Each structure stands twice: as structure tokens, then as C-alpha cells.
């Protein structure tokens, strides 16, 4: 099915003084409102600066003019920003919809807010929003949530969220869905995270499965690019492919590793991205530098003898990016893709070291399992018990250390990775 995601920049022009574009705010329109608006897939998305910004997105089956209203928690001073919309075709019983985006960029650090959507005199309920206070924090990290029916993923994510109610945001490291152009799967994923993503933001990375068409051919990850309006600090011509954001004293650099899948459309993706990544990481003044990427920098040999022989070593993505991570002083690299959870410790100049970035591949959050597929790599310091099941991770940052804890679905601790720096 060919996607007809036509970009209808319907700048929902609400009659609000001083409100000219998403991000610039004014007083909310006066008059009586009814809490009868029913947006779906309401989601917060990280901003580049989460002490003062946030992106809010939602979907409706009509393309009317929408706005976002917000206030400090408990306040009667309601502000408003315009929303812009993009039409998105449905499939498999999922209706056509409009994806709305509103950007907030004048928030106060460490402050509790509430927001709601508005269409005419109809409004949604209020949702909570908290800005980054600049201190220590916790985040939930998942990867490869792609699934056959998303029931295992639903239980895993909801349990992880309930065990970590203080999480400031969550990360999905790509292959968010099994087929990136299947809107039914996207809505299944959004339904799973619905009780969390409207309260705390997501920081997604694009995976190769986001770049497959419905007939399993390579394509641009159009639905991913539509569903997540990400910080505009990457390449203007490759908006939402790669980006960076800050939380606390950590700078996160999020990469697009789908070179093979996107090559016919963006043949120079890696060259552009490498130049951007080096500049992005070097320019950050944050104490900690963390890279998020879907495809893993290491290459593994197959344990299954029926598979073609393949030497262990480093993937094309690793060969391209690891020298940049060395050069720019990256502290931690989190990856996914191989559906296995392994800690490699410090690697520098493609060798085991006592310094340089720490590399961890995070396993899987969905139910597409590869039991016994990979041999142990010479650089592996920890390998999850085999055959592997799904898992989730919790990332914590404070002044002196980063802690990444991996858990089984029942909450049993698998492993901890600790990176310290004075």
C-alpha cells in the first residue's frame, strides 16, 4: 500500500492575540468550554531543552483547527499555542487521521504544568507535564518493541512504568514496530504506552523496521517521521532522522543507523550524520555524553550452523561512528537491533580498554526473540542468560555516575553497568 501522507501544514489559526506559530504563546480564548474533545495517541516528545520546552502531539479523525492550552498546575492563567497538522492515511481498519503538533518553548525549569487540547469550544481533559529540574533523574529504556500482537510488550512496558513512577522520560531505541508503514501497529504501540506517554516524554530512535514498506521493501520511514516531531537541531533536510537533547547534566545524541534501508534516498546519510554528530557532541557543555542508536556497533558470528558464516568484529555502523565517539569523549553508547542484552565495557580504538566509551546492547522489549542466535563476542563482558527473553532497562544519572540496570519482565535484576566520573 502506497502511503499518502501528504503534508498539509494546516496551521490551526486560533483567534488568540500574540499566537502566531507553534511555540509562541498567548492568552487562551475566553468563553465557556466543554470537556468533550477526544484526542487519541496523545504524546509528549522530548525537546532539545527540556528545562524550558516540550513537544505535544495528538491525533484526531478530523482536520479542524486545533490548539494546545497549558498552565502551571493549579493555576487559572491558561496560555495557548497553535497546533499544526499533517494528514495520515490509515489502514487495516485504522481510520485516516490528522497528526497535530504543538511546541512549547517558554516553560520554567523544574515546574509542574498541565496541558489540554482544544478544538473550537471543545477541550480535552488536563494532562500533567513536568519540566527538567536540571538535577539527577531516572529514565526507562526499551528497545525492539516490535511484536506480533504487542501483548508481551504491553505487559513489559506497563510493569516497567509502574515500578518506576518517578521516571522523567522514556527511550525506545528503534524497531518500535515490526513494520514501519503499518498504522495498525503504530496505534497498538501508542495504546500500550498511552498511560505514560501523555505524562512523560518519549525519546525515540529510528530502527530499520521503521524503514520497511507493507510489502517488506526498503522505504523511507515516513510514519515514524510523522509520528514523532523531534528537536530541530539535526539536518534541516532530514528532519526527525537524528537529533539531540539534554536532560539534567546529560547530553543525548540520537542517531539514524538505517544507512542500508535509506541509501537510495539518502546516499550520503552517514557522511552528513557523522559530521553533525561530531559537532553536536563536541559543542555540548554537559558533564555526560550518551549516544542512542538502533543498530549495534559490533558484528557477531552466528551460533546457528545453518546460518552463513560471518566473522565477528565491528559493523559498518561501528566502523563509521566509533572513532567519532572516541574523539568526542562519549561516556556511554546504548544500542539495540540484535535482540540480545550484552555489556562490553570500555572500548577504545576498536579494542578493549580501561577508558573510552562503554558499550551496552539492550536486548528486546517485544516478542520477536532470537534464542541462541549469536555467539559470544570477544569484547562481551556480560551476556544475559540464554535463551534470552525480553527485558527492560532503567537509566539513572547523578553528579558522579551513570547507572544502567537491566531487568527481566518480572522485575528481577539481570545486570548493572556503572560509569563513574569525578
Label every model-predicted segment.
Residues 174-177, 284-304:
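Short acidic, glycine-rich surface-loop motifs adjacent to enzyme active sites
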Residues 103, 112-128, 185-285, 308-312, ...:
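Extended active-site neighborhood of metal-dependent phosphoesterases/phosphodiesterases
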Residues 122-173, 178-179:
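An acidic-aromatic substrate-binding cleft motif
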Residues 141-143, 169-175, 201-208, 290-294, ...:
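Active-site neighborhood of phospho(di)ester-bond hydrolases with catalytic His/Asp-centered motifs
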Residues 76-97, 141-155, 180, 216, ...:
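Acidic/histidine-rich helix-loop elements
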Residues 145-148, 176-179, 208-212, 249, ...:
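Solvent-exposed loop/turn segments at secondary-structure junctions
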Residues 2-22:
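Sec-dependent N-terminal signal peptides of Gram-positive bacterial secreted proteins and lipoproteins
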Residues 17-141, 162, 394-422:
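Acidic, histidine-bearing metal-coordination/catalytic regions of metal-dependent phosphoesterases
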Amino acid at each position: 500500500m502506497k502511503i499518502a501522507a501528504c503534508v498539509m501544514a494546516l496551521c490551526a489559526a486560533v483567534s488568540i492575540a500574540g499566537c502566531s506559530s507553534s511555540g509562541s504563546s498567548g492568552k487562551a480564548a475566553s468563553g465557556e468550554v466543554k470537556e468533550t474533545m477526544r484526542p487519541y495517541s496523545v504524546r509528549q516528545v522530548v525537546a532539545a531543552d527540556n528545562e524550558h520546552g516540550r513537544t505535544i502531539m495528538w491525533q484526531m479523525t478530523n482536520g479542524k483547527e486545533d490548539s494546545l492550552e497549558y498552565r502551571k498546575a493549579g493555576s487559572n492563567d491558561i496560555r495557548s499555542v497553535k497546533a499544526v497538522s499533517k494528514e495520515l492515511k490509515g489502514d487495516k481498519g485504522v481510520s485516516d487521521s490528522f497528526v497535530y503538533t504543538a511546541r512549547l518553548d517558554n516553560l520554567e525549569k523544574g515546574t509542574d504544568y498541565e496541558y489540554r487540547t482544544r478544538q473550537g469550544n471543545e477541550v480535552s481533559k488536563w494532562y500533567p507535564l513536568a519540566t527538567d529540574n536540571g538535577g539527577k533523574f531516572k529514565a526507562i529504556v526499551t528497545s525492539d518493541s516490535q511484536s506480533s500482537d504487542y501483548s508481551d510488550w504491553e505487559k513489559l512496558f506497563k510493569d516497567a512504568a509502574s515500578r518506576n513512577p518517578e521516571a522523567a522520560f522514556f527511550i525506545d531505541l528503534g524497531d518500535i514496530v515490526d513494520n514501519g508503514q503499518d498504522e495498525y501497529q503504530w496505534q497498538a504501540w501508542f495504546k500500550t504506552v498511552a498511560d505514560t506517554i501523555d505524562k512523560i516524554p518519549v525519546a525515540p530512535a529510528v530502527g530499520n523496521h521503521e524503514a520497511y514498506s507493507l510489502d517488506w521493501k526498503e522505504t523511507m520511514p515516513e510514519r515514524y517521521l510523522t509520528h514523532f516531531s523531534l528537536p530541530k537541531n539535526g539536518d534541516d533536510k532530514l528532519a526527525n532522522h537524528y537529533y539531540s537533547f539534554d536532560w539534567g547534566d546529560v547530553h543525548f545524541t540520537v542517531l539514524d543507523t538505517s544507512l542500508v534501508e535509506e541509501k537510495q534516498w539518502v546516499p550520503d546519510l552517514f557522511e552528513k550524520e557523522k559530521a553533525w554528530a561530531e559537532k553536536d557532541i563536541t559543542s555540548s557543555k554537559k558533564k555526560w555524553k550518551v549516544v542512542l542508536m538502533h543498530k549495534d556497533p559490533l558484528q557477531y558470528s552466528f551460533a546457528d550452523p545453518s546460518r552463513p558464516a560471518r566473522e565477528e568484529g565491528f559493523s559498518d555502523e561501528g566502523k563509521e561512528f566509533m572513532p567519532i565517539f572516541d574523539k568526542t569523549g562519549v561516556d556511554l553508547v546504548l544500542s539495540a537491533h540484535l535482540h540480545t542484552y550484552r555489556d562490553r565495557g570500555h572500548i577504545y580504538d576498536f579494542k578493549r580498554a580501561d577508558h573510552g566509551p562503554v558499550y551496552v546492547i539492550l536486548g528486546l522489549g517485544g516478542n520477536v526473540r532470537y534464542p541462541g542466535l549469536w555467539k559470544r563476542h570477544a569484547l562481551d563482558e556480560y551476556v544475559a542468560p540464554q535463551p534470552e527473553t525480553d527485558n527492560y532497562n532503567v537509566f539513572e544519572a547523578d553528579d558522579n555516575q551513570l547507572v544502567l540496570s537491566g531487568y527481566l519482565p518480572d522485575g528481577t535484576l539481570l545486570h548493572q553497568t556503572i560509569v563513574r566520573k569525578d
